[in-house]
Structure formats: C-alpha cells, structure tokens
Amino acid sequence: MAFRKSNVYLSLVNSYIIDSPQPSSINYWWNMGSLLGLCLVIQIVTGIFMAMHYSSNIELAFSSVEHIMRDVHNGYILRYLHANGASFFFMVMFMHMAKGLYYGSYRSPRVTLWNVGVIIFILTIATAFLGYCCVYGQMSHWGNMNIASNMFNMMKTIYMMMLMLLIYIFYTIMMRQMMKTKEYTMLIKSMDYINKNKYMINLNMTNKKDMNNNIGPLNMNILSIIYGSMLGDGHAEKRKGGKGTRIVFQQEYCNINYLYYLHSLLANLGYCNTNLPLIKTRLGKKGKIRQYLKFNTWTYDSFNMIYSEWYIKNMSGKGNIKVIPKSLDNYLTPLALAIWIMDDGCKLGKGLKFTTNCFSYKDVQYLTYLLHNKYNIKSTITKGNKENTQFVIYVWKESMPILTKIVSPYIIPSMKYKLGNYL
C-alpha cells in the first residue's frame, strides 16, 4: 500500500485531494462550499487582528478605528477586507443555498443536513449583526442604541406573531376542517384501513432502521438505483475482511440495452469504471448455453450499511438471506420503481407482474403495502411454486395508468413494452 494511504495523517489528505471519489456530474456550483470556508477564514483572521487594536469604550472607539486605518501596518486593508468579506460571505452563502434548492438538497435523505445548514445560516446572521453593534464600527452611537434595540424587539414581536399564527392554523382551521362531513368520512375510512393493516404498519414502524445518518458519499440517485435493482436481480457482496461492500448487477443478454443504461448511470455518478460490461456465458437448464452481462461498483465502506439492511444470517445453515429492509419506504422513489420494473417486471395481459425468488411472504406483503401506501398502486400476491420459495406480485390493470405516469420519465425505449399500451 502506498505511504500516502497507510499513513494516518497523509491518508486524510489522500482521501480528500488525491483519490477523492467525486461523481463526473459535479459542476462549478459545488465550489460555493469551499468559497464559504475561505470567506470564514478571512473574517476570523481579519477580525482577530482588528480586535487587537479596537476599543469598545465610547470615548475611545472612534479613535481606535482611526488608529487602525492610519497607524496599524496595512490596517486599512484589514478593515476593508473584513467589511467587504462579510458582504461576499453572504453573497456566496445565498448562492450556496440557491444551489441546494435547485438540486433538491433539502429532500430526504439530506433533511438533517439541510436543517443544520439553516441553523448555521441563522447563527451567521446573528454574528454579523453583533458586528454592527460595535460602537463607532459601522454604526453611530445613536444607531447602536436605537436601531439595535429596535431590531431585538422586532425579533420578539415576529416570534410572538408566528407562534400565534401557528396556534391559529393548527388548532382552529384544521379542527374546523376535520369536522366537515367529507374529511370526517375520509378519517373513518383511514382508521378502518389502518385497523385492517395494523400488523404491517406496526412491523414497519417498530423495525424501521434509519439510514439517513450513515449514507456517507451516497445520494438519493445512487440509493434509488441500488435499491431498485436489489428488488430484482442485483445483489450486494461483502468483501473479504469486511473492508467494504460492492453492488453487483446482472442481466440476461436479451436485456443488454437496459444493463448498458444502468452501467452508464453508475459510471456518470462515479461509482464504477467506464468500460462496458462484457458478454459472458453460463450453463442453464437442460444444458442450454445462456449469455449474460455482469458488472459491479467499486468497493465502498459506506455500502456496508446497505448490506446490513438487505441481508440477515441464515439460521438453518451457512450464508445470509436476502430480505426487504424496513427503511425501503424512504428509498422506493419513482426512479427505484422504474429500475425494479426494468429489472424484474414482466407484462401480463393488461397488468404487470413481479416474480420474487429471494423474499419471504412477509417481505412480499410489505412490498405490496408500500406500493399501495406510497403510490396508491393496488396489487395481489400469489404463490409461484409449491415449495413457497417464489411469490408473484400482480399489479392490477386499474393501477397501471398511475404506475405508468410515475415511472415513464425513467423507462428506456427498449423496456417500454413492459408497460403495454399505457405508455
């Protein structure tokens, strides 16, 4: 192993600068974060040096500012850097927030990260406001005594008004609406539905494992692709020594266009090499030679949590059993649903079917519950064989228009036949 990777300190530099796995779809908007760090360093350094010469005494404040401008070596540069650096700080911060809004960084699984950013933004505003309260800094003594106090009083007033508004909305309007006949009927129906499905809901709520804090370099796109494929023929491989996990994708030769599409998605996100998967052969049933394609992602430590979610120990023998993770409701996005259809779906009459070979009946029940609860897609379950090792999910033809509308933006041309005449 190279010294830059084995050394404790150099490995940090290596992982962030040299071998940093960045997706190829990244653009210049991602420079805003580092520019914010640069602005912060400038503000801290210039602020510390100016604080060495500034006096907050009302009789000395103005003189100390003039002292910084005239007597301190390059003091005027420090003052102008600090004043204009604050303006650039907020300009870059607003651009950083605009980038996050444009790319949907506030959505799951980045909700917590966005909330922390909002808190940092509010603290930055408060810190900058304290700078304006410095005597004879950027504000006169009169402004300091009057405007500052008025600002704080206004904040208290806004807080009380928002609190009263929230109380009015949540306790008045919603309670009135609840008593209307239509909403009341919907509530009774919802309670009846929950009563009938309380086992599945309880299983979901009690066993759900939150993965949002363990994602690492992942994002919703890569998780949607992986989870959608894992519902079909994809699987996760834990590397020897527990040093990481890779995701393996495999398809028959007849689905070559779909596998190339899947490979291009992952390659563009930077999770696998750009070489096209090669055609391989294997011995099928009755000695028939079958052609297939296969590729895998790089090995990542952050994929370990995906493995732990999808696999449990086999109590009756060696190896692990593939299961449906209880956190799937967070990641069964339209993209994941489209990947599952292209990976494992099959047109049947005016409907669609999914054949599951790895999951138990309870897992398949949970899948149908998610389809109905998340997208209002109705389906039924039947046994695929006598050994109860295979179950088939049939999507009703009444739900096909809904399903088609959800997944159509992600279905490639060679797979549109699976949706029949609805597309």
UniProtKB/Swiss-Prot annotation:
Region: Maturase, residue numbers: 144-423
Keywords carried by this UniProt record: Membrane, Mitochondrion, Mitochondrion inner membrane, mRNA processing, mRNA splicing, Transmembrane, Transmembrane helix
Region described as Cytochrome b: spans on this chain: 1-143
Keyword Transmembrane: yes
Phenotypic consequence of residue 339 to D: Abolishes maturase and endonuclease activity
Compartment(s): Mitochondrion inner membrane
Residue intervals annotated with topology Mitochondrial matrix: 1-31, 106-115, 175-423
Xref: Pfam families: Cytochrome_B, LAGLIDADG_2
Ranges annotated as spanning the membrane: 32-52, 85-105, 116-136, 154-174
InterPro entries registered for this protein in UniProt: Cyt_b/b6_N (IPR005797), Cytb/b6-like_sf (IPR027387), Cytochrome_b_N_euk/bac (IPR048259), Di-haem_cyt_TM (IPR016174), Homing_endonucl (IPR027434), LAGLIDADG_dom (IPR004860)
Outcome after substituting residue 393 to N: Abolishes endonuclease activity. In box3-2 /G1909; abolishes maturase and endonuclease activity
GO-annotated molecular function: electron transfer activity; endonuclease activity; nuclease activity; oxidoreductase activity
GO CC terms, sorted: mitochondrial inner membrane; mitochondrion
Outcome (variant: residue 355 to A): In strain: Capensis / YB4237
Membrane-side (Mitochondrial intermembrane) residue stretches: 53-84, 137-153
Membrane topology reported for the UniProt record: Multi-pass membrane protein
Domain of life the protein comes from: Eukaryota
GO biological process: mitochondrial electron transport, ubiquinol to cytochrome c; mRNA processing; RNA splicing
Physiological role: This protein is responsible for splicing and maturation of cytochrome b mRNA. Specifically, it may be responsible for the splicing specificity of the second intron.
Family to which the UniProt record says this protein belongs: In the N-terminal section; belongs to the cytochrome b family.
Misc. comment: Encoded from partially processed COB mRNA that terminates with the in-frame coding sequence of the second intron.
Designated name of the protein: Cytochrome b mRNA maturase bI2
Gene: BI2
